Structures are given as C-alpha cells and as structure tokens.
C-alpha cells in the first residue's frame, strides 16, 4: 500500500487489502478468546449507547466544506492522524510481574504476550515502523486525497497540546502496584478510544467518500477502510486481555491483599468510560467553534456559519447522570 508516495504497511492479495502482522496475531487472539469461552468467562465490552458520535458529524463537516470553510475539517483529520501517531507510546507501557501480582497462572493468555509482541505490533500499526508508514501516514493521505492537499495549519499540534498541565492522578487502587494500575488505565483508555473510533471511521468514509465534497472519493474512503480493518485486532486483543484479568484475582503490593479482578476492571472501565464519553465531545465542540472563527475572517459570516453548524449538531448527550452507575456490558466469549 503506497499513500502520498510513502510505502505503508499492509498490502494486497488478489486485489483485496490485507492488514499487517496478522498471520500469527489474529489466530492467537481467536485461541485466547476460545479459552475464555471454554472457561465460561465473559468478554467486557462498551454498550453502544455510551459511544458518542464523531464531532463534527457528517452533516456538519459537509456543510463546512460546501461553504468553502475547509480548515476546521482539515484540522479535525489532522488531529486524528496526530493521535494515531501517539499510539506508538503503547510500546512504553511497563507490564507488571504477573507471577507475583496475579494469583492464577497467565500461561497461554493474551496477558502473557503483551510485552513480547502485542504492544509492539500495536505501536507499529499506529505510527509506522522504520521506512513503513502506519495509520498516522494513512490518515494524512486520506485527508490529502479527499480535501485536495489542503494547507495544514502549523498550530494544530500546539493547540492540541495546550490544554493545560494534566492533573496529578489519584490512585484508584493503591493496594495494587503502580505498574499494574498504570497498565490497566492505559489499556482501558486505548480500548475505549479504539471502540469510539468505529464511528470516526464511518464518518470519514462517508465524508471523504462523498463525491460532492471529496476530490478523490474512492481513494480517500478506501484508505480509511484499510485503517478500520487494521484496528480490529487492537480492539480484540485488548478486550481479551482485560477480560482475562477480570477473571482472575489480583495481589496487592504487600503480597497478602487480594482484589477481585472483576471489581478492579469494572471500576476502572466505568470511570474512564464516563470521563472520555463526556469530556471529549465537549472539547471537540469547543474546538470546532474556535476553528470556524479562525478560518473565517469576516466576523459576521463566521457567526452565521457557526450558528448553522450548531443547528446540525445531533444533540447527543451521555445517557447517565454523574451519580448513576454505568452498565458494564458483558457478552459471551
């Protein structure tokens, strides 16, 4: 697969796109999932009602493009590419000592393979490896094909990173090692992001595949479809690994305290899901409004475009109050 004159991962067999690093990874994930099924352990998953729609939505983004206000859409697609590049950080996750921090054996599980290949394969998929491009470069190519090589604002990364210093994280389960809790938080966050991304893929394929607003609809939509296929094993292995840990007993740093894996995983999952499904959409709304006013120099027209843009908002809100406990949907492995 070559995009923007960059050799990317993956390729074609008889004209069909084949994702990279799947010959061993995909059957291994199926086997680990089957072991959960045989043991009658469920898979944790995110209920669809908790998944916020992409912002801006298709109608909003198409409206901007038809109005000639391309920059906000360019920014949105560029941010996706940048965030994909950040995915390389998953290789830096420090995996705890499962032999001393989990009561039951993890032999023959996805957990046992996180540090020996799964995290590294995930990182290479997202950010590329050596001279091969990954999803970062593929998103950039889809953007450039669909929007006809738009001018990229030079402040996208700066504005993305200027949200202020992150608050000091309060330990959720201080009984556990810092490494165990940090790994769980990272894996949960990435799984939530990857699950939310399914709506982003559908949005991008529809928008960039729309001949009314896309310069190269077939090529742009195809690249996004390739990325979507590549992401499937990410969701699958993270789901399986977290479900494996959920079915086990975690041992505290004192070597004596034990915690139910289900209690810990469900607690982390509920907390992170609520935060990401409420904060991220609001941030996207605020950023989109600011982007419109940056892109349109005429203040009166900018206000008019922004109002019409808001009228096309789907109005989605998170379905639970802050004091309500979230459902954690479990399904058969």
Tell where the protein language model's regions lie, with residue ranges.
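Non-heme di-metal
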Residues: 1-333
């Amino acid at each position: 697969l070559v995009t923007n004159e960059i050799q990317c991962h993956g390729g074609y067999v008889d004209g069909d796109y084949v994702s990279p690093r799947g010959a061993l990874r995909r059957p291994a994930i199926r086997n680990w999932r089957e072991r959960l099924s045989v043991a009658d352990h469920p898979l944790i998953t995110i209920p669809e009602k908790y998944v916020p729609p992409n912002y801006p939505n298709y109608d909003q983004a198409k409206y901007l493009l038809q109005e000639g206000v391309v920059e906000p859409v360019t920014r949105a697609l560029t941010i996706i590419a940048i965030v994909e590049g950040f995915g390389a950080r998953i290789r830096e996750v420090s995996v705890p000592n499962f032999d001393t921090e989990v009561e039951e054996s993890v032999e023959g599980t996805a957990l046992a393979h996180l540090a020996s290949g799964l995290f590294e394969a995930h990182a290479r998929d997202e950010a590329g490896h050596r001279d091969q491009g990954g999803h970062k470069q593929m998103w950039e190519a889809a953007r450039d094909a669909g929007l006809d090589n738009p001018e990229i604002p030079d402040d996208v990364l700066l504005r993305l990173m200027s949200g202020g210093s992150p608050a000091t994280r309060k330990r959720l389960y201080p009984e556990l090692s810092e490494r165990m809790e940090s790994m769980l938080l990272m894996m949960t966050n990435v799984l939530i992001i990857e699950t939310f991304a399914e709506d982003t893929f559908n949005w991008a394929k529809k928008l960039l595949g729309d001949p009314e607003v896309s310069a190269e609809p077939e090529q742009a939509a195809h690249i996004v479809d390739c990325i979507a296929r590549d992401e499937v094993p990410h969701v699958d292995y993270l789901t399986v690994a977290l479900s494996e840990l959920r079915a086990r007993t975690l041992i505290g740093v004192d070597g004596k305290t034990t915690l139910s894996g289900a209690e810990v995983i469900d607690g982390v999952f509920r907390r992170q899901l609520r935060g990401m499904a409420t904060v991220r959409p609001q941030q996207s709304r605020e950023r989109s409004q600011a982007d419109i006013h940056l892109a349109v120099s005429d203040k009166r027209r900018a206000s008019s475009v922004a109002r019409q843009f808001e009228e096309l908002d789907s109005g989605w809100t998170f379905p639970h109050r802050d004091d309500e406990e979230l459902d954690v949907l479990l399904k058969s492995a």
